[in-house]
Amino acid sequence: MSKKPIIGITMGDAAGVGPEIIIKSLRNRELYEQAHPIVIGDTKMLERAAKILDVDVSFDKKTKDEELMDTEFGKITCIDLDILPEDLAYGEVSPVSGNAAFEYLRMAIELANEGKIQAICTAPLNKEALQKGGHMYPGHTEILAELTNTEEFSMMLSSPKLKVIHVTTHVGLIQAIQMIKPERVHKVIQLAHETLSNSGIKNPKIGVCGINPHAGENGLFGNGEEEEKIIPAIQQAVKEGINVEGPLPADTLFFRAQRGDFDIVVAMYHDQGHGPIKVLGLEAGVNITVGLPIIRTSVDHGTAFDIAGKGIVDERSMLEALHQAIELAPTK
């Protein structure tokens, strides 16, 4: 049996930069020394990207039932779903490519559930195209949760300088505030503790953001949300032996976290967490969905329609996402 994990790489929306960042990342020989990378997508889109990038590589088309551990550097193995037309336009929202991105992910989840791959690494999809293709989800995370019957999950962003986990994600700010409950905050603190502990960090230090400016400043700002929604969750986590502090003003907490005072920050809503991490490390940032029964990592950027097909995309986030998937994946 192989000790190297099989990593399923979904191609994302092929009208974007997904095929290009996959081709560029798989030029790294070390990936093949550490794992068996398998692309799930359309081979013809990868061939087109390789031509744009002037990369000399061959392709090995597979079905889901074929042997997946015979990968080799210089030959990209692809489970070819053959959904897209050869003349798919770059940089345009397309229901066809949106549907294809969903099907790639659905196939990856099926393979993971069957034990044929040990982790999933996703290239970006376009949310508008996804929904125009008939799949009414905000993004990858929610698809993964539904198709794996997972109720409690969270998005974790990881960069070399900072890790952030979110209480709420793809909802409007007013709805996010309504969704923040002590039970949810407590669960996310637990997920942060478990995820970092499992990755080898002993007694990880967790910092929790407030909701209001200055974390409410003892009721001066807001309507007591910190006292009602966050403090009870932190108190419960402390009783469980979790090393957690807060609620703290978000600006102060992120400064202290990037300085090394905390191993991870619990953000209350999407932009509270995404803004700082993208300022500090967009190129090498990674999105990790925690709480799922399968390992999933992703790039921390979108489809970049404005540069798709031009051969200039930076692949560092995809490469780091692959490294994280390999590190987190169980071996066979």
UniProtKB/Swiss-Prot annotation:
Binding site for a divalent metal cation: 170, 214, 270
Binding residues for substrate: 140-141, 278, 287, 296
SUPFAM superfamilies reported for this sequence: Isocitrate/Isopropylmalate dehydrogenase-like
Highest taxon of the lineage: Bacteria
EC number per UniProt: 1.1.1.408
Matches recorded under InterPro entries: PdxA_fam
Record keywords, A-Z: Carbohydrate metabolism, Metal-binding, NAD, Oxidoreductase
Cofactor(s) of this protein: a divalent metal cation
Any GO molecular function: metal ion binding
Catalytic activity: 4-O-phospho-D-threonate + NAD(+) = dihydroxyacetone phosphate + CO2 + NADH
Cofactor binding mode and count: Binds 1 divalent metal cation per subunit.
Similarity-based family: Belongs to the PdxA family. PdxA2 subfamily.
Description of how the protein assembles with itself and partners: Homodimer.
Function: Catalyzes the NAD-dependent oxidation and subsequent decarboxylation of D-threonate 4-phosphate to produce dihydroxyacetone phosphate (DHAP).
Name of the protein in its database record: Putative D-threonate 4-phosphate dehydrogenase
Species of provenance: Oceanobacillus iheyensis (strain DSM 14371 / CIP 107618 / JCM 11309 / KCTC 3954 / HTE831)
Taxonomic path: Bacteria, Bacillati, Bacillota, Bacilli, Bacillales
